[in-house]
A protein has these predicted regions:
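Compositionally biased, non-globular sequence tracts
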Residues: 2-4, 13-127, 136-205
């Protein structure tokens, strides 16, 4: 399965925030996805093992975790998180809040655009060929989240924000003590631009 087949577009400042946190943004995000996939697979197996043991039609279980996960995913009584939410009373709607924030769109009539983010300013592409997951890995995650792309965008935004906070925490006091600075930007994005333009800026990642 390939998600984000056209890549993920971010701004140069968002890229800088990522690179202030890690040396390779794509590798870090991919590593995070891999770790999350394993944790979701482990959770799925832990949740379902008692049910499998109680099912008289199950005479043996695979010793391999991936094969065991595939057995669970193939069962008639297995439901994805989206299917469970749709069957709830009342049904739980599809949540793509992270995507909405990232794209600067609205959800249910509420503006969710982040003040500093203008999607049209995005000029950097991450994962230009998309992110590839095996069907089993994707389905293990979908046991617990409604939408894969919304989940990945949430993780990406989290890393960007951590890098931004780390950068600001280090350089804001330096700027405030700099007599040559006569005015401060009114937005975080403007502050990031100011920090990146400084001759004493050193990338943290």
């Amino acid at each position: 399965m390939i998600i984000f087949s056209d890549g993920i577009q971010i701004t140069t400042n968002e890229q800088a925030c990522l690179l202030h946190l890690v040396s390779d943004a794509e590798a870090s995000i991919q590593r995070g996805i891999t770790e999350k996939v394993k944790s979701r697979r482990d959770a799925l197996i832990e949740e379902w093992r008692p049910r499998l043991h109680a099912d008289s039609s199950v005479t043996e279980l695979p010793a391999d975790d991936i094969a065991l996960a595939e057995l669970i995913l193939a069962r008639d009584d297995y439901k994805t998180r989206l299917q469970q939410d749709a069957a709830a009373d009342p049904p739980v709607p599809l949540d793509q809040h992270n995507i909405a924030k990232f794209e600067g769109t609205s959800r249910a009539g509420k503006t969710v655009k982040r003040p500093d983010r203008v999607p049209g300013d995005a000029t950097v592409t991450l994962f230009a060929s998309g992110i590839t997951l095996t069907d089993t890995d994707a389905n293990c995650v979908l046991a617990y989240v409604q939408d894969l792309e919304n989940w990945v965008i949430g993780a990406l935004m989290g890393q960007i924000n951590r890098g931004k906070k780390k950068m600001i925490a280090k350089y804001h006091p330096i700027i405030m003590d700099d007599d040559s600075v006569s005015a401060m930007p009114g937005t975080e994005d403007g502050l990031i631009t100011m920090i990146l333009a400084r001759s004493d800026y050193v990338r943290g990642g």
